[in-house]
Amino acid sequence: VIVAIGLLDQIDERGEASRQKTQASQLLTGLDWILAENQSTESIYFGKVEAAKVASMGMSCGGLQAIQISADPRITITVVCNSGVLPDPSPIPGMPPLSKDALKDFHGPVLYLMGGPSDIAYKNAMDDFARVDHVPIVMTNLDVGHAGTYARPHGGEYTPVALAWLDWQLKGRKEASGMFLGEDSTLKRDPEWSIETKNFDQ
């Protein structure tokens, strides 16, 4: 189950200027909803949601929202895409007012999917990685900039990396860890990617 902010059938009806700003709290509202549906015998989702395996994911400002809600004890893992916490809380309206202290609230494994040095969030993300020493964390970079590979067919090169992370961390498929861990990992052997990992028991 994927809980996201907004309805797909509204996208074509809204121009760029009319797009609504969202809050991280809306993600937790969505999580509250699906977990309640999981308990309701009248819901099509009754008994179908694994409540102990929840990923918080987001891109750019949404990545900051993903970090912000990762303090919630129900969040199992975090995926931060093309994002990183600014050195000082942003004064920009609508952007999560996070400080680097938010990184201390991670309590599960974290994956960063970044666009390399040309990604506007690159320096912030690399600083995040350097600061996190209490949970397993992976930093991946593909030199595609801040827009990532989302517009490419099937989400492009980011997709197999994200799926391998979810398979490994949420589904317990240990073979998927081969994407990330060890000198012979899939991403280590791919010259297009760079990867750093730490805090894993190997």
Stretches found by the model and what they are:
Residues A17-A52, S56:
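Alpha/beta-hydrolase active-site loop
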Residues T76-R152:
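The feature captures the conserved acid-bearing segment of alpha/beta-hydrolase catalytic domains
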Residues G58-G62, A66:
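Gly/Ala-rich beta-loop-alpha elbow adjacent to hydrolase catalytic centers
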Residues V1-D12:
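Conserved alpha/beta-hydrolase
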Residues V135, V144-A147, R152-Q202:
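Alpha/beta-hydrolase-fold serine-hydrolase catalytic core, especially in secreted/extracellular enzymes
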Residues Q68-T76:
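Conserved hydrolase catalytic core segment
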Residues T22-T29, W33, D127, E157, ...:
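Extracytoplasmic/secreted proteins, especially bacterial periplasmic and envelope-associated proteins
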